[in-house]
């Protein structure tokens, strides 16, 4: 049924494609889930059309969209930081 609430753990999986929108921005940035911890999602660092990395401000709100087996999962998250090894990634809060 449309609008049903689902737990993030049932939808989000390592390797899954996700799309992000930053606060006050309608540009879509594509990414992929690299790892999932108890409280964080580690996602590949998105790049813009010129292949420049997108790095939000710490604490910036993000809107995410992932397509699951039978649903489109929308969620809000917060940018916590970035890392570069072994690949450039964002560290964001894990939605509930």
Regions found by a protein language model. Give the residues of each.
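Structured alpha-helical
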Residues: 1-96
């Amino acid at each position: 049924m449309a609008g049903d609430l689902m737990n993030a753990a049932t939808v989000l999986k390592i390797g899954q494609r996700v799309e992000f929108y930053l606060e006050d921005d309608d540009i879509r940035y594509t990414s992929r889930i690299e790892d999932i911890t108890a409280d964080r999602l580690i996602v590949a660092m998105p790049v813009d059309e010129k292949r420049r990395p997108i790095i939000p401000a710490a604490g910036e709100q993000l809107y995410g969209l992932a397509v699951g087996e039978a649903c489109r999962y929308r969620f809000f998250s917060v940018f916590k930081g970035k890392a570069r090894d072994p690949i450039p990634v964002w560290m964001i809060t894990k939605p509930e």
